């Protein structure tokens, strides 16, 4: 049981379950609960890949900053075991998303989002373009589920999802700004600093709220599956 908990923590369990829950609720709304559970599970597998690859890549930096809340640093989990689990999971996640209820199109779109998450871990968190992968990945999630039910995702859904993703990126970085700079992590929030990041978060949330207040939410999130 302790080992399972360590794997869950290494997957960044909070954000992973948040994305998984959102996917279930959206799928249940657009389809029905049966495939929604399967979609949530396949989404969960993709999020595991993002979380685990992040902790694998950050291992040396986490050791440097003595982040004992990380299972790899505390010794609850060995890095070779996490690498092995990640490589085993990779083909399973690919097949589950492409051959599952998301379908080839929906699965490919969702996997694009997963790829963005992994690309952030290894490359984009050091670049000024760091918000770009959040923008794409968070749009890919709802888009994949709309495609699964043969519907085109409305632009307002893509816009709000993308902007919320970018806002989350800025908010998520705030607590680690000084440590990130010490580790030469130079994403856009780290370059702009706390005050500018807070302003950007506020602006993005106002834009999202404005879009939502002027969008046909109830009619959009209605199942058309007979």
Where are the regions that the model predicts?
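Multi-pass alpha-helical membrane architecture of UbiA-family
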Residues: 1-226
């Amino acid at each position: 049981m302790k080992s399972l908990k360590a794997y869950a923590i290494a997957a960044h369990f909070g954000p992973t379950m948040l994305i998984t829950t959102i996917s279930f609720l959206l799928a249940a709304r657009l389809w029905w609960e049966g495939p929604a559970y399967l979609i949530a599970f396949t989404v969960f597998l993709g999020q595991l890949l993002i979380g685990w690859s992040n902790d694998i890549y950050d291992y040396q930096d986490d050791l440097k900053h003595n982040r004992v809340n990380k299972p790899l640093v505390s010794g609850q989990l060995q890095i070779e075991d996490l690498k092995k689990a990640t490589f085993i999971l990779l083909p399973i996640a690919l097949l589950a998303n492409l051959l599952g209820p998301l379908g080839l199109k929906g699965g490919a779109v969702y996997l694009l989002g997963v790829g963005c998450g992994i690309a952030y871990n290894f490359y984009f968190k050091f670049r000024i373009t760091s918000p770009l992968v959040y923008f794409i990945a968070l749009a890919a999630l709802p888009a994949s589920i709309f495609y699964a039910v043969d519907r085109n995702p409305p632009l307002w859904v893509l816009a709000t999802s993308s902007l919320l993703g970018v806002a989350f990126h800025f908010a998520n970085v705030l607590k680690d700004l000084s440590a990130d700079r010490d580790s030469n992590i130079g994403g856009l929030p780290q370059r702009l600093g706390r005050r500018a990041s807070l302003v950007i978060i506020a602006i993005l949330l106002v834009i999202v709220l404005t879009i939502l207040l002027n969008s046909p939410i109830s009619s959009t999130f209605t199942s058309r599956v007979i």
